[in-house]
Swiss-Prot record:
Lineage, top ranks: Bacteria, Pseudomonadati, Pseudomonadota, Gammaproteobacteria, Moraxellales
Family annotation (PANTHER family): PROTON/GLUTAMATE-ASPARTATE SYMPORTER (PTHR42865), PROTON_GLUTAMATE-ASPARTATE SYMPORTER (PTHR42865:SF7)
Function: Involved in the import of serine and threonine into the cell, with the concomitant import of sodium (symport system).
Protein's name in the database: Serine/threonine transporter SstT
One Gene Ontology term from the biological process aspect of the record: serine transport
InterPro entries in the cross-refs: Na-dicarboxylate_symporter (IPR001991), Na:dicarbo_symporter_sf (IPR036458), Ser_Thr_transp_SstT (IPR023025)
Primary subcellular site in the record, as a coarse category: membrane
Protein family: Belongs to the dicarboxylate/amino acid:cation symporter (DAACS) (TC 2.A.23) family.
Calcium listed as a keyword: no
Gene3D superfamilies membership: Sodium:dicarboxylate symporter (1.10.3860.10)
GO cellular component: plasma membrane
């Protein structure tokens, strides 16, 4: 039996864990207090690895970033950044229009102070940026961690190849540890689902359904409205034939592999069939699999604002714009590990003074809905890589 279960994919295991958790909560509610330990251990494990994960992944990706010599690379990068920012803005609007409430253990947020004016937020942001790096990691100050990772990464871009390789090896090692933690996600999710449904009942299903609807609806909006607008402005023509071709031939594959990196060969093959210059595609598509994460920006923004709404924190427009920028920067590091966007939610939550403990509960909620969220997110991310690359190449041919 154990051997059969071990052969199942992580998605299948999570689905089974959710079904078992709901069943135990409804049929044997008195047992659920004993199952809470599984969920607590899982959240604790996520809390312990998240700070070093963010630091190492961002540092390594920036230090090893190679710009290349393709003239078409700069406009592709510009589309990547603009696309992620617009995706985050879309997520803000969707979250305001359809606010979601999460079921969280918020006992520890009694001392939580809502951010004041924009000046207070910027002041706290700047103070977080210049935190001691060791203290930032130990106290899970994700803004400080991000600042030091970016700074060191930029400085190490001029270091030797050996040093860069060491950082990449450390990044792979940390990712391997994360994979081990994620492997226990079904057990943790089983405990979390059982306790949540025992406490809140079937109303929890409605909460998760609305959260999923906001997430998936926003990603579809980005894929079918935002991206076509950007591509249409680039190629100065009807973008939809190219959009649908990329969604069909790249997005569907990425949906099932749930990995932008694994979808790189598919995208390179599609780019070749679209007649894209190989010198552009060979750089922009692997780079896109690393930094172009519009779906991750949506996930980080929606789940952060759902947390803010749940805790009753008032947020003004200026703060939401800052959140969109932070979500975009955070999303660039989401490719380091499967479900990486969820593990970067604490970075955005720290903007609002939300504790790491509560943020990790949100990560656990994300794990529960990740069966659909992560697949759709990857489909959007990966199909956008080849879409923007092809659009810039078409524009280049038009100008030549």
């Amino acid at each position: 039996m154990l051997e059969f279960f071990s052969r199942l994919s992580l998605v299948t295991k999570i689905i089974i864990a959710i079904i078992l958790g709901i069943g135990v909560a409804l049929l044997f509610p008195t047992v659920t207090p004993y199952l809470s330990l599984f969920g607590e251990l899982f959240i604790k494990a996520l809390k312990s690895v998240a700070p070093i994960l963010v630091f190492v992944l961002v540092l390594s990706s920036i230090a090893n970033f190679q710009v290349g010599h393709s003239a078409n690379l700069r406009p592709v990068l510009l589309l990547y950044v603009v696309g992620m920012l617009l995706a985050a803005f879309s997520a803000v609007i969707a979250s305001l229009s359809f606010p979601s409430t999460l079921y969280l253990n918020t006992v520890s947020h009694n001392n939580l102070q809502a951010p004041g004016s924009l000046a207070d937020i910027l002041k706290n942001l700047l103070l977080s940026f210049i935190a001691n790096p060791v203290q930032a990691i130990s106290e899970a100050n994700f803004i400080g961690i991000l600042a030091w990772a970016i700074g060191l990464g930029l400085a190490m871009r001029h270091s030797s190849d050996t040093t860069k390789q060491v950082m990449q090896d450390v990044s792979h090692a940390v990712s391997a540890i994360i994979h081990k933690v994620i492997a226990f996600a079904p057990v943790g999710i089983f405990g979390l689902v059982a306790v949540t449904f025992a406490d809140a009942g079937l109303a929890t299903l409605e909460s998760y359904a609305q959260l999923l609807a906001v997430l998936l609806g926003t990603m579809l909006f980005v894929a079918l409205v935002i991206n076509p607008i950007l591509v249409g402005l680039t190629i100065r023509g009807n973008p939809y034939p190219l959009v649908f071709k990329c969604l069909k031939e790249s997005g569907i594959t990425a949906f099932f592999t749930r990995s932008s990196a694994a979808n790189i060969p598919v995208n390179l093959d599609l780019a070749e069939r679209l007649g894209v210059n190989p010198s552009t595609a060979s750089v922009s598509i692997p780079l896109g699999a690393t930094v172009n994460m519009a779906g991750a920006a949506v996930t980080i923004t929606v789940l952060t604002l759902a947390t803010v709404h749940t805790l009753g924190i008032h947020v003004d427009l200026a703060t939401m714009i800052i959140l969109s920028i932070v979500a975009t920067i955070s999303a660039c590091g989401a490719s380091g590990v499967a479900g990486g966007s969820l593990l970067l939610i604490p970075v955005a939550c720290s903007l609002f003074g939300i504790s790491s403990e509560i943020a990790m509960q949100v990560v656990a909620v994300g794990m529960i809905i990740s069966v659909l969220q992560d697949s759709t997110e990857t489909a959007l991310n990966s199909s956008t890589d080849v879409l923007f690359t092809a659009a810039v190449d078409i524009r280049s041919r038009q100008n030549s």
